Amino acid sequence: MKNILKIFLILGLTGLLAAGCSDFLKPLANGSYNEDNYQDYPSIVRGFIVKAYSLRPDTYYTTEFIGAEAGTDNAVYRNQTNSTRQFSVGTTSISANPFRAVWTRSYQGINYCNMFLKDRVGINTHYLLDHESDMVLRKTLQGDAYVLRAWYYYDLLRTFGGIGTDGNLLGVPVLTEPSEAENLDPASIKRATFDETVEQILRDCDSAEVYLPFNNRDYPDDKVYSTPITGSARYRCFDQISLNGLRAMTYLMWASPAYNPTGDKTRYQKAAEYAAKVMNHKLHVESTFTGGFDPAVGFSWQDLNNPEIIFISSMGNSTTMETSLYPQGFGGSAGIVPTQQLVDAFPAENGYPITDARSGYDPKKPYEHRDPRFEAAIFHNGSEVRRNTNNELMYTIESAVGGKDAPGLTGTSPTSYYIKKFVFSGWNPYDENVVSSVHAVFYMRWEQMCLIFAEAASKVTSPNDGSMFGISPKQALAYLRNRPTTEGKPSYVAQNGDPYLDECAASPALFEALVKNEWRITTCFEGNRFFDLRRWTANPSDLSAINVEIQGVSITGDAESGYTYTPTVIERKNYPSIWRPLPYLDVRRCPNLVQNAGWESWK
């Protein structure tokens, strides 16, 4: 512990303590702490966990969320010089890896956790005068350290795991001890296998479960879970429910074709089991609270206390979403916009794909009678922006040729579409007193657990079978398709039946395709699309799912005489590999750090 305050990782983390710990590594007023007695100062030790939590992104408008979608067939950057756009079309340079921040941040977070766990310094530190409360806090912080380390390794593995240039399926370097700069040999930094990295994540989850509170909710009749230390006081922190969510996410990734060459179905079963645990808690425990969870009730992205949430980031009041996603005519910049392919992925209101004649889809009126989730996620020509409080019309999207929001103008979408999901409809740049809203990232939420369960459970039982897990895969998808939108608009299939879901549930192949499309539309702009396309790819040399032509639409005509819709090509993705590259400089520094296949020149 002598050199604990000098710790940093060679993996892109030089200066960690100088920059990262300055917020909490402060002496008392008389300056009386040093390297030997720093554990006497609980704010320092607790600060390791506080800092590890604070490193998580707190806005969807980053490279990892909406930006990541722009690397797929869901969205595109308006700015052609954006590093993520250049990366996806094959014109990037080795110095412009847009995902390096994930690598750096994750290893910073891991190192803070390792510092807390080293020699049990964190759990042996006294934080509070009241003994009972102090012991509860010690346990929760110990659980936080383990699960945050698991979380950051999951993030690293999802981003950088893959087949290396040596032909092996690799994970990331696994470090479970604080690293001292003067003793760290760059040659010792090696990637664990993919399986070994998963096993480390699951071990940390098992360790965390011993210490974490059951649920970050207030239980008035339970003394332990109603202390000021647990319950809602820990909102935004992990509990055993979100821990099981992390397990479900990890097992689903591990079970997927890209990472499961032997086709081990027990991984799918574990993913389904943990997702079902989370779902059952929502359905049978949180549903009993006042204002608790109800799967038949929608939610708002601006309601950061809504029971949809399982694990959430820190929150902040900002206008980033609005100024980045609206067109310039309404105070925005159209930084990232939806594609025609994503628009086409939303079914008709009766649940059928628009490619199915039974959908009633009319290509001359492409936005009519669509699944209401489409209108809640995407602005199209003719969409109205209405104030959330009184339904006042504030703006109308005019993206037909000649309109104020048409492609080719400053600050307008090249595809003719704009992202509606996440924007606050109480914001108007022309108000005398502009109102903003709180925003956060919903890292885990109810709908995501439904998707994990539907996908995983359908691999080990039939879509209609609810006997194995207490819920059927079909029911999990029905929860999504029957639910009112985030704007409160009712589901057509909830009121009139969902024959297409019934049809798909009778065919494993159709059900699998439906699950994949529900992943796409339910979590659009949340950063999952690239990872989903990759994990579903059994042959790593098959790039057809990611190297696609990105389309928009050119709209001519007017409302009176009718519109004509002509597909346009915006760009073509040109990835050399389904794997993302490790940061170039770190591969150069560490001679035994194997680069991912397809990025041989980045070493």
Language-model segments: which ranges?
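Long, intrinsically disordered, low-complexity segments
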Residues: G20-C21, R78, S106-G109, F194, ...
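Conserved, well-structured interaction surfaces
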Residues: S54, N82-G162, L184-R217, P363, ...
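Membrane-proximal, proline-rich intrinsically disordered regions
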Residues: C21-T72, G291-V297, P347-E368, I378, ...
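Bacterial Sec-dependent N-terminal signal peptides
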Residues: M1-G31
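Short, surface-exposed recognition loops and adjoining beta-strand edges that mediate ligand/DNA contacts
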Residues: D36, T62-T81, L129-S133, G161-T176, ...
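C-terminal substrate/ligand-recognition segments
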Residues: P372-N482
